Amino acid sequence: MDSDNDQDFCDNVDSGNVSSGDDGDDDFAMEVDMPSSTERQLETDDYQYKVLTTDEIVQHQREIIDEVNLLLKLSTPITRILLNHFKWDKEKLLEKYFDESDDNTEEFFKCAHVINPFNKPTEAVRQRTTRSQCEECEICFSLLPPDSMTGLECGHRFCLSCWREYLTTKIVTEGLGQTISCAAHGCDILVDDVTVTKLVPDARVKVKYQQLITNSFVECNQLLRWCPSVDCTYAVKVPYAEPRRVHCKCGHVFCFACGENWHDPVKCRWLKKWIKKCDDDSETSNWIAANTKECPKCSVTIEKDGGCNHMVCKNQNCKHDFCWVCLGSWEPHGSSWYNCNRYDEDEAKAARDAQEKLRSSLARYLHYYNRYMNHMLSMKFENKLYASVKQKMEEMQQHNMSWIEVQFLKKAVDILCQCRQTLMYTYVFAYYLKKNNQSMIFEDNQKDLESATETLSEYLERDITSENLADIKQKVQDKYRYCEKRCTVLLKHVHEGYDTDWWDYTE
Amino acid sequence: MSSLPRRIIKETQRLMQEPVPGINAIPDENNARYFHVIVTGPNDSPFEGGVFKLELFLPEDYPMSAPKVRFITKIYHPNIDRLGRICLDVLKDKWSPALQIRTILLSIQALLSAPNPDDPLANDVAELWKVNEAEAIRNAREWTQKYAVED
């Protein structure tokens, strides 16, 4: 990534815009400049990943097969099945193969659902293949000459048209690729790709088959991941699997380990938990628990939206009178101003405490959720900003500015989006974080980045005229440099915490 | 309706010529893909003495996909639910086009002899089968007497 603006005059330029009065408290947490970890780059360049097209993936697959075959010297289709069995981990395959080569070869091939290629054809197979009279196909019950029949090394033979139909059904209807087994009942020997291609004449089915085996290659290979962006057909290949920021040729940036949008500083597992939490209705039920009670008589769920504690159930068949506080019948409360004599009973107190706890955990969740969603929505708007910024840049070039001079605007939007995204995920991180001294520094960093980001966003929405142009440019540049720097500081701090175990989690 | 594939015609013929003991499958007069099936409860099983009615249908892409089979007679069995649906591997992912109506019905008969409560379809039945097999077997006998024995 480019880091051409790492000039460090950001600190003093910032004091310039404090005077513009939009960020009140700027006693931010600069004390994060701790020793160590300065050498740690957030975007290290030593992570050499590649973006591959579908053709390149197929090519890559072939290279792996050839590489392994230099050592195994088996046929290509068999090597392919073996590799697929070992999830395309060639080291593991070779290790197992040479480990077990003497006495357990049989077992090795059996596990991979291949007939041992070193076996001599069994008597049965030989007999069947050398037979000259007609055979009955066990699928269509037709009597056919031997040249219309075929089968795998396992010796189960069916007619060509049944094979064709069988394979087509498996590929098209069931979406199977590398894992289609022999058509005989109970036989788990796999059909290799060359045989499939030979037996299936339909070009469309062949294409589908190719897609399926390429897909399973990418899916089970730990060093490959499809770009999760809609309609993108690229895959990313990495030197080792880790949560890293990868940038697809289509423009999408994502985390290699989990496939979500790049989510630094929060870790994959917390983000996964968070997304699940946001997706399922667990919070809906929390809300119901926190805000409603059940009628003690008919159990209908009631939300109390005001009024006194004398409840009359609205269920027409029930109409029960009860006290909202103790859930007891209203009668003993008497006609005097409500005075719930059971209010302090242990049971009632426990129920109240439980409800209180749910309520506060809901409030806590909503606090983080709202901020998370807010940045996510803003980020969507910022994407629109690119279009308007492009227009602005053209206008400015008409005002006698050169192309290079107006590039700062695009850069500003880039940084704005980057900051929004980071901020968004800081709320997920913070949600699971237990409070301690470091978490408070983190929150200060977060607050500071957030207010700077909002200011930058505001600047970018202002109209730019030829009069204020120079001024705006200065302000925008100062601000984005500041934002960028604060973002780096925040991430560095969190990473340092990961390295030195500062962070405690709530779950 | 498209003409009946050779496979189905042949299979039906053979089924009629060489019937399997304890199993009877007759195609419907109006639909050659629909079979009226009768399976007798295997000896030494709680279903002994019972006569179970089933229906069997060969879908359009048979034999590439498995026949659809369902018990019509009520039966107390951990792998058969209230609607008579059967949990059996060869009717699902272990189906092979080289299997036939005959082999499938034999598998079903075998399932009656060897219920598998670890892979249940009827959860309550399977549960009882595991915690109190004697009582489950008693229930199965009762149901057999009640629903599968004609007076």
UniProtKB/Swiss-Prot annotation, chain B:
GO MF annotations in UniProt: ATP binding; ubiquitin conjugating enzyme activity; ubiquitin conjugating enzyme binding; ubiquitin protein ligase binding
UniProt-recorded name of the protein: Ubiquitin-conjugating enzyme E2 N
PROSITE patterns: UBC_1 (PS00183), UBC_2 (PS50127)
SUPFAM superfamilies: UBC-like
Keywords of the record: ATP-binding, Nucleotide-binding, Transferase, Ubl conjugation pathway
Catalysed reaction equations from the record: S-ubiquitinyl-[E1 ubiquitin-activating enzyme]-L-cysteine + [E2 ubiquitin-conjugating enzyme]-L-cysteine = [E1 ubiquitin-activating enzyme]-L-cysteine + S-ubiquitinyl-[E2 ubiquitin-conjugating enzyme]-L-cysteine
Pathway assignment: Protein modification; protein ubiquitination
Active site: 87 (glycyl thioester intermediate)
Keyword Kinase carried by entry: no
Gene Ontology terms: cellular component: cytosol; nucleus; perinuclear region of cytoplasm; UBC13-MMS2 complex
Species for this entry: Drosophila melanogaster (Fruit fly)
The family this protein is said to belong to: Belongs to the ubiquitin-conjugating enzyme family.
CDD domains recorded: UBCc_UBE2N
Summary of the knockout phenotype: Mutants in this gene exhibit several, largely neuronal defects including lesions affecting the neuronal connectivity of the giant fiber with the 'jumping muscle', and the axons of photoreceptor cells R7 and R8 fail to make the proper right-angle turn into the medulla (hence the term 'bendless').
GO biological process: one example: flight behavior
Residue intervals of the UBC core domain: 3-149
Enzyme Commission number, as recorded: 2.3.2.23
Stored InterPro entries: UBQ-conjugat_E2_core (IPR000608), UBQ-conjugating_AS (IPR023313), UBQ-conjugating_enzyme/RWD (IPR016135)
